[in-house]
């Protein structure tokens, strides 16, 4: 569980009052630990023969479907998953775990280093979605208004500090 000033770490049955604090994952297990645990689990059962990329992907999609069912038909006005009853929270934890396990297994089978791939993808996303064009917008990067305003104009609109910078640069 969390320590003072550590932020919330998620577990089933956590009280709703903790939802106001920032959420943080536990430092362990790492993705490599999860890959190893699943590989050992599959090897003990001689299941590697069934873990071709296609099969892992279909299993992943099935688990995403089970996760989606937990949210299906819930009203947008209902409290979020943080306030669900313990039985529903436990189901949420299990389905999210299944999704992660299959995602890690698929990445391992395809030799994709997920942590490095995430770093690379975030760099790509930063280029596709510059803050000054995408802040507060749900538009896809191909629909963003490229070249219509400068970064200083967008970020600094109404900001006294940016107005001082603009004046100093003229």
Swiss-Prot record:
Modified residues annotated as N-acetylserine in this record: 2
Gene: Dctpp1
GO annotation terms (biological process): dCTP catabolic process; DNA protection; nucleoside triphosphate catabolic process
Expression tissues: Ubiquitous. Highly expressed in heart, liver, skeletal muscle, cerebellum, brain, and salivary gland.
Record note on pH: Optimum pH is 9-9.5.
Known outcome of mutating residue 63 to Q: Loss of activity
Keyword Cell cycle on entry: no
Temperature sensitivity of activity: Optimum temperature is 60 degrees Celsius.
Quaternary assembly: Homotetramer.
Required co-factors: Mg(2+)
Keywords, in A-Z order: Acetylation, Cytoplasm, Hydrolase, Magnesium, Metal-binding, Nucleotide-binding, Phosphoprotein
Name of the protein in question: dCTP pyrophosphatase 1
Effect of residue 98 to N: Loss of activity
Subcellular localization(s) per the UniProt record: Cytoplasm, Cytosol
Reactions catalysed according to its record: dCTP + H2O = dCMP + diphosphate + H(+)
Modes of activity regulation: Inhibited by divalent calcium or cadmium ions.
Modified residues (Phosphoserine): 2
Source species of the chain: Mus musculus (Mouse)
Effect of substituting residue 102 to I: Reduces affinity for substrate and catalytic activity by about 50%
Protein residues bound to substrate: 38, 47-51, 73, 102
Function: Hydrolyzes deoxynucleoside triphosphates (dNTPs) to the corresponding nucleoside monophosphates. Has a strong preference for dCTP and its analogs including 5-iodo-dCTP and 5-methyl-dCTP for which it may even have a higher efficiency. May protect DNA or RNA against the incorporation of these genotoxic nucleotide analogs through their catabolism.
Record's GO cellular component terms: cytosol
Effect the entry attributes to changing residue 73 to I: Reduces affinity for substrate and catalytic activity by about 50%
């Amino acid at each position: 569980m969390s320590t003072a000033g550590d932020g919330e770490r998620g577990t089933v049955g956590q009280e709703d009052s903790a939802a106001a604090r920032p959420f943080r994952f536990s430092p362990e297990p790492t993705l490599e630990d999860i890959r190893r645990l699943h590989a050992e689990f599959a090897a003990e059962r001689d299941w590697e023969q069934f873990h071709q990329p296609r099969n892992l992907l279909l299993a992943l999609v099935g688990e995403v479907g089970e996760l989606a069912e937990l949210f299906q038909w819930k009203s947008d006005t209902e409290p979020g998953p943080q306030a669900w009853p313990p039985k529903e929270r436990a189901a949420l934890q299990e389905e999210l775990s299944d999704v992660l396990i299959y995602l890690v297994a698929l990445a391992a089978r395809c030799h994709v280093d997920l942590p490095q791939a995430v770093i690379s993808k975030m760099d790509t996303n930063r280029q596709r979605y510059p803050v000054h064009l995408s802040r507060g917008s749900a538009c896809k990067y191909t629909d963003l208004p490229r070249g219509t305003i400068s970064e200083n104009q967008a970020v600094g609109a109404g900001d006294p500090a940016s107005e001082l910078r603009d004046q100093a640069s003229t």
